[in-house]
């Protein structure tokens, strides 16, 4: 999906509770991959008002002469996504969706590198194949990447085979550029269904949602984004931001303000292991 198309679709969505799956949680994921029960409900995030028409974008087959890919380890089928991380101390996790984007992602990576911080990037397959060097940079700098589908569709409006194609093609593209298959998956718009959980588990991916939505996808202004992060900061919080899908210049400027503030406040910004 092109940038203007994704932005138009986002504007069709309401900021509300992620009622299609992110309202509860499968547990909190520890930096080492453990779990604990009873996490809090998710903060408001981008939510679908109605199912848009299926994308006309056709998934591009990935071809090559390399060895066959190893079958992923099957996981437990969740019924709700993870919303937070667990562990002792003031730990938080930063996540960025919809990229990589050559205009905004490099600036975000530069800021993270400046403060020696690692983050999670949930990538769209069509962006991965167009920006392989950015995905390689994420791997080199220790960031963890996840699967965010190929064209960013509303999964609840797709047939099961269409969901599988979106997810499988994206995992293949990520492996080609990142060097490893993703072990985390995030549904576009936070709209989960049973098929997404089942297919993700079959592909060796755990579902990850978020605790605090920066609302940067609405371009609310830098000060609003900064306030959302700083007021929502708490141990275990997973922050949702975007590095693509529209004008993300506010996101780029905002992270330069709130990231040093979080670090000065004693927070440790962590990521799950690259291999669970």
Predicted regions located by residue number:
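Alpha-helical structural elements
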Residues: 52, 77, 117, 143-145, ...
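N-terminal pre-catalytic segment of deacetylase/amide-hydrolase enzymes
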Residues: 1-94, 101-114, 257-260, 264-276
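Active-site beta->alpha N-cap acidic-glycine motif
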Residues: 57-158, 162, 166, 171-173
């Amino acid at each position: 999906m092109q940038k203007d198309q994704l932005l138009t679709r986002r504007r069709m969505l309401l900021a509300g509770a992620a009622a299609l799956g992110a309202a509860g949680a499968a547990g909190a994921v520890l930096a080492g991959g453990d779990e604990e029960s009873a996490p809090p409900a998710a903060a408001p995030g981008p939510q679908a008002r109605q199912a848009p028409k299926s994308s006309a974008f056709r998934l591009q087959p990935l071809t090559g002469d390399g060895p066959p890919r190893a079958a992923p380890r099957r996981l437990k089928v969740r019924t709700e996504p993870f919303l937070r991380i667990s562990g002792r101390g003031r730990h938080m996790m930063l996540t960025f969706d919809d990229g990589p984007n050559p205009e905004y992602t490099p600036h975000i990576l530069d800021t993270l590198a400046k403060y020696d911080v690692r983050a999670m990037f949930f990538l769209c397959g069509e962006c991965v194949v167009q920006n392989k060097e950015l995905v390689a940079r994420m791997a080199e700098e220790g960031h963890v990447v996840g699967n965010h589908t190929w064209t960013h569709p509303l999964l609840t409006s797709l047939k099961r085979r269409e969901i599988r194609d979106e997810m499988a093609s994206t995992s293949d593209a990520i492996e080609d550029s990142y060097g490893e298959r993703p072990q985390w998956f995030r549904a576009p718009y936070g709209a989960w269904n049973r098929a997404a959980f089942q297919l993700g588990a079959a592909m060796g991916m755990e579902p990850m949602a978020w605790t605090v939505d920066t609302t940067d996808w609405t371009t609310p202004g830098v000060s609003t984004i900064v306030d959302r992060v700083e007021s929502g900061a708490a141990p275990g919080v997973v922050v949702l931001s975007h590095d693509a899908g529209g004008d993300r210049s506010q996101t780029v400027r905002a992270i330069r303000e709130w990231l040093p503030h979080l670090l000065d406040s004693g927070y440790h910004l962590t990521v799950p292991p690259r291999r669970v």
